[in-house]
Curated annotation (Swiss-Prot):
Organism: Parvibaculum lavamentivorans (strain DS-1 / DSM 13023 / NCIMB 13966)
Transmembrane feature ranges: none
Domain of life: Bacteria
Pathway: Glycolipid biosynthesis; lipid IV(A) biosynthesis; lipid IV(A) from (3R)-3-hydroxytetradecanoyl-[acyl-carrier-protein] and UDP-N-acetyl-alpha-D-glucosamine: step 6/6
Protein function: Transfers the gamma-phosphate of ATP to the 4'-position of a tetraacyldisaccharide 1-phosphate intermediate (termed DS-1-P) to form tetraacyldisaccharide 1,4'-bis-phosphate (lipid IVA).
Enzyme Commission numbers on file: 2.7.1.130
Keywords: ATP-binding, Kinase, Lipid A biosynthesis, Lipid biosynthesis, Lipid metabolism, Nucleotide-binding, Transferase
Molecular function as annotated in GO: ATP binding; tetraacyldisaccharide 4'-kinase activity
Family: Belongs to the LpxK family.
A GO CC term assigned to this protein in UniProt: plasma membrane
Catalytic EC class: transferase
Protein name: Tetraacyldisaccharide 4'-kinase
Amino acid sequence: MREPRFWYPAQRNSVPLAARLLAPLGYVYGLAGRIRRGRAEPQRAAVPVICVGNLTAGGAGKTPVALTLAEGLIAKGEKVHFLTRGYGGREQGPIRVDPLRHAAADVGDEPLLLAAAAPTWVAANRSEGAAAAVRGGAGLIIMDDGFQNPGLAKDFSILVVDAASGVGNGRLVPAGPLRERVDDALSRANALILTGRGHAGDGIAARARARGIPVFNSIVRPAVAPDFGAGPFLAFAGIGRPEKFYRTLRELGAELAETISFPDHHMFSESEALKLLVRARELGARLITTEKDAARLSHAPVSSARWRLDEAALRLPVRALIGDFPSLMAQIDDAVSRARRR
């Protein structure tokens, strides 16, 4: 889905009419979530669980953060496994993701990215997924998303917030982008990471610091050095905030002839793939997209337009560059040590 414009009004203190009209539904949504979390009895996994989650619906950059944390922990000798819901996939799990066998329609796009870095499990029931990961050899679990899911106890919870958009109009879904009230989320957070550049996240950062929650800043950087010498490019993306991807490309020196955006987790049709191929030829441009979008094009039938688009498009793998990363890792190490002493 595309985020409604009234979720992020140009005037930060204004409340658009649509948000006011939908506020009662937001109240019901928030109340249902609080009741669900209040009644839940979280199951504790046999290994430490680190959660990387969002406060808002849409893309805040949590997956690059999860990948960066995994790389740091693997370098320390941890047997890291990812656990995720697999948004957009048909599998309920628990199931271990196999990139050679599974497509995005099976397990979702993000699990395919995670599986390239560490063993990854998709499970609608997180506690069952954690148990499956432990049986599969996990020594530590990173849960990508699931901050609002009360089924599995977390040993260290990280909230990821986009610095450029913050908490938007501050309303709950569907009146705004919030999955829960800010104070409720902060009461369970051990760290806050602001991704990207901007000041819209300053307010929640101040509230986090007032509670003694450490705040870290992060920017997205390519995992490998890109070669943009043979531009221009037609960039396309179906992610939460595609403009962030386009901005990153420009900052890296790419000449963008055109950009084409799709809804988050969009499954490309044959006609859409063909239109992208034709438009790139008309512009004399090379195609470039995100790793997530490329994951959704994988396993397309050979010679189909989607297969040709997958073959033609350059993809930009990214990781989060987290400021004061050693401090964050030290706090995670402490939480992991405490969990193992239980």
